[in-house]
Amino acid sequence: MKVHKGDTVLVIAGKDKGAKGKVIAAYPERSRVLVEGVNRIKKHTPQSANERGASSGGIVTQEAPIHVSNVMVIDSDGQPTRIGYRVDEETGKKVRISRRNGKDI
C-alpha cells in the first residue's frame, strides 16, 4: 500500500471530500487508512466504572477507517499527487516519489 502512517492526505471522494488530515494508522490487509478528523462516527459503548469510580461509556465520537482509493497523498509542494517508487542508488532501497514532480516523499 502506498499510503503510510504519518502521511498528510486529501480526501478525494465520499462525505468528507476535500478534507485534509494526517494518517493515524494504516491497515494494508484491508486497504484502509485512519485519517485524523475524517469519517467521524458515533459509537455507542456500554457504561462501565473503572477502579477510581469514574464512569466511562455512552456515545463516543471517533474516526473510522476509509478506503485508500478515496485519499491522495499531499506532496512537499502542498498538492495532491499519486505515488511512485524508485530504487535509491546509494542504499539500494525502494523510496516513494511524487508522480507530479518526481521528488522524494
From Swiss-Prot:
GO molecular function: rRNA binding; structural constituent of ribosome
Signal peptide feature range: none
Keywords from the named record: Ribonucleoprotein, Ribosomal protein, RNA-binding, rRNA-binding
Keyword hit for ATP-binding: no
Record Pfam families: KOW, ribosomal_L24
Record InterPro entries: KOW, Rib_uL2_dom2, Ribosomal_uL24, Ribosomal_uL24_CS, Ribosomal_uL24_KOW, Translation_prot_SH3-like_sf
Gene3D superfamilies referenced in this protein's UniProt entry, alphabetically: 2.30.30.30
GO cellular component term of the entry, any: ribosome
UniProt KW RNA-binding keyword: yes
Function in brief: One of two assembly initiator proteins, it binds directly to the 5'-end of the 23S rRNA, where it nucleates assembly of the 50S subunit.
Family: Belongs to the universal ribosomal protein uL24 family.
Oligomeric and partner information: Part of the 50S ribosomal subunit.
UniProt-listed NCBIfam families: rplX_bact (TIGR01079)
Protein name: Large ribosomal subunit protein uL24
Protein's organism: Mycobacteroides abscessus (strain ATCC 19977 / DSM 44196 / CCUG 20993 / CIP 104536 / JCM 13569 / NCTC 13031 / TMC 1543 / L948) (Mycobacterium abscessus)
